[in-house]
Amino acid sequence: MATFKSAIGLMLAIVMYITNGIGSYLPGIIAEPLSTDELSSVINDFDSVPIAEEIIVVEGGRVNKDERAAIQSLQGLIARTEAKIFINYGMDSKSELQDLKDNGHTLSYTDENGNYWTLKNLIPRFASYIKDNGYVLFSDSDTHAQINLAFNYTTVYGWLAVPVSAEETVKALGMEKKYDLSTTELDFTHERDFYEEHKDFFRKDTLVHLYSYASGLRDFAVQQKIYITYVEDSDYVARAFRDIVFSDLEPSAMILGWCKYEIKFTQCASRFGHYVIPSDHSFNVSLLHNIQTQATDLGQDVTAPELDPTKHYVAIVYSDGDNAQWISNGYQEFHTWQSYEDMDMPITWTFAPQMNTFSPTAVKKALANKDPEDSFITGPSGAGYARISMMSPSEVRAFSDLTAATMLQSGLTTMTLLDKINNEIDYASYAHKLGYFARYDNIKGGIIQIDPDPYTNGYGGGRGRVFFANDKPFVSVGYSLWHPSGDMSQVTEEWIKEQADAINSYSADINSINGYTVINVHPWTVSPASLRYFIQNLDDGVEIISVDELIAAVTENVPHKNAKPDNR
């Protein structure tokens, strides 16, 4: 019977794949933009709760990962009423804890007897938050289906999720086992049956997609009643179940977490009109998203710069700003760059416009450390990581509405898109879809990171071509500092100089796209030190401006028609 259901599920997935694929090529009619008031209603409205005056700080290194998972389920249950627990995972916790302290909260690292916080002293203190003093037992925190399904039970029934290794501890505290998953070899059919029975309990605008070894997000999922699953994209049968979950979500749903196969996963999410925010190691979100923030303005007022016709203009932009965990866990490349005060060069940083959801502290820190020369644009692809080539017109419209709303909220005016475009037919379809974003006054244009060629000129598949939509330019990456080894340690000064020499060979022409290049910097292979050396090797005929300035300059000086640079 299970095999028959699996076959039916696989057939359904194939039908969905074909239907969504055909729909992505239909041109669609670009409707009028939403009003400012209407835009405010399309952003995910997560429940907010007060933050307790006393914050219980659990030192993550003093409990094993299984016990830490149980504490995380308790953290989420408590945070439905009041955010009280912060688990110190290291990373950038120091800044977040200091921010809480500065806001008047007391940080408690031990109980009244001087004991560090563990299940033994947390459960008696917070037993009233656990439904019926019960727990759901799961095998361990290393098995995707076990930990995720246990947390889904926690979300629905309010029981603590407890691994086998911690069962004796909770039994000694008088807790009662309500359900046992630990002895069952779970597969997607168990998940599917649970999901079909309980799906109406979960939010429809958000999903958590999280492998077992990631410790983030599950507290937030319990607090906000978000369904958790994880499917390898190589498992086509299990993907049939995930496709059903995707299809049940509202348009432009937020997919939190991450995956093993980036392109396959983001393409699949995009086929259903959704977007991904990489956040598998985003910690304590059930508490942090409740921090009160001032209005955030990541943007800047920009006019077209005064141009020298003898110079070639480049904008240098760090990729991967869609990655919420990278930003919240230190944004190391950004902060390292601040040590190069003598550079005095404008660097553009992609940044998640919904970052306040995960860590307002990280947003505040980025703004505080921002050099006056630096600027922010959205990460790919606006509101989050999506591939609009895979979306139908109605899905692009909904996603563009959300993108405009998040950009208005964050003050950003230039967007980044990322996609895989294989041929001129795809380019024509893509160019039309850009009009959905360009219809909004607060979106001035954008840059496009185009695959293929991830390890020859990563994100530079568009070779600098420009698309105009509603008289706004969307300029594809013309060159990428992305080492073909994928290994930062393999980057040499000789290789960096070769890249600079290539840029030095580009022509000056302020009145055509030939005179402008967006240079992508891959943060996982090109360090700030390597970027500094690259800039030092650029000739006087190359001028660095921000992405915002480049978009303004192209808007003012380049004919408003789609074009490719010569000889690239």
Please place each PLM-identified region on the residue numbering.
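Metal-dependent polysaccharide deacetylase catalytic core of the NodB/CE4 family, i.e.
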Residues: 84-87, 135, 139-148, 152-214, ...
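Acidic/glycine-enriched edge-of-secondary-structure segments
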Residues: 98-113, 216-232, 285-290, 311-325, ...
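Non-catalytic propeptide/linker segments at domain boundaries
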Residues: 213-343
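Mature N-terminal, pre-catalytic/accessory segment of carbohydrate-active enzymes
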Residues: 2, 6-201
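Acidic-and-aromatic substrate-binding clefts and catalytic sites of carbohydrate-active enzymes
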Residues: 29-43, 56-70, 77, 85-98, ...
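Short, hydrophobic/proline-enriched secondary-structure or compact coil segments at domain edges
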Residues: 130-144, 251-261, 512-525
